[in-house]
Amino acid sequence: MRSSLLATAMLICLASTAHGQKAQPKTERRNVAVEVFQVLGLPVNVHEAVLLPKDGGYLLRCRMSNESSSEISGLRYVLTSIDVVGGTQLIANRTEGFGLPGYGTKSLTFVTPIKFNPKEGNRFVLMVEQVLSAEAIWEVIKAKDTLEAYVKGDYSIQPNVMRVTNLVDAPTQIRVIY
């Protein structure tokens, strides 16, 4: 009697466990961690980058800090996938606009979805290529070559940054006529 009661209890436990496993969705999308390749010459540092699932794509969320006195109005970034086998694939190359005050920090979620299917075991690397402010533009020289070297494990190549005056978005100078 006791052994049949124990067998019945175990059968019920196994059946409920099997039923619970079938109820879970098979294609559950999760947040994807992103490694950030920091470029030291840029006035923006990116931290805590993650891809959030949303409507068939992913949104990039990150925390940014501004190391300059001028307000940052946008940036251009590259998101690359590193396959387990060693191949790389460009996922996104985007320009995003936002407002980040001088010496400020902000958490941002870029609302333009990135459409791709992440594979299990892939690494994702984010690199900022260009930073825009009203006074200046910071551009990484040979950003593609630097990112390719970083992805292959060659950390000896450091990116060079060129800073130029922003003549398009620069505020107009006040002229005093005597």
Annotate the PLM regions.
Residues 70-74, 89, 172-174:
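Short acidic/proline- and small/hydrophobic-mixed sequence motifs that coincide with surface turns
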